[in-house]
Amino acid sequence: MSLLSKNIKNFFWSLFKLKNESQNSIIEISQDIILNVMDKLSNFENKQGFLKPISLHSLAKKLQTNPKYLSKIINTHYEKNFSSYINDLRIQYLLKELKTDDSLKKYTIKTLAKKIGFRSTEAFSKTFKKHTGFNPSTYLNTIKHK
């Protein structure tokens, strides 16, 4: 729990009841479970586990939690679905690395996509453009000349 701020704790304190759309029932998630999952997610991010292809179910298993809980916690805390959460982490990581590692600027788009865990160049390009406003090749050409 070392990386969790008081704001996150307070925010998740309000997450006791989450609606399960498929059964139209209420799932109760205790504060302890929420904080535990958030701590494990923070650890996952710090260890850059998002750089490998990963699914909601495989991450839930790795974090020793329920996929529905994990999905709801990500949806509520990050205000995005699981795929967007993972892909955004990947793009943020790449943008940071491009600032410090000039060798990455020489990679092909396909190689960059695979290096940060994307299975397809198309998904990488779409996410990259959504995040930066530029397609990857334009962005790389721009930073190469700086």
Model-derived features: where do they sit?
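Cytosolic nucleotide-binding catalytic cores of signal-transduction proteins
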Residues: 19-146
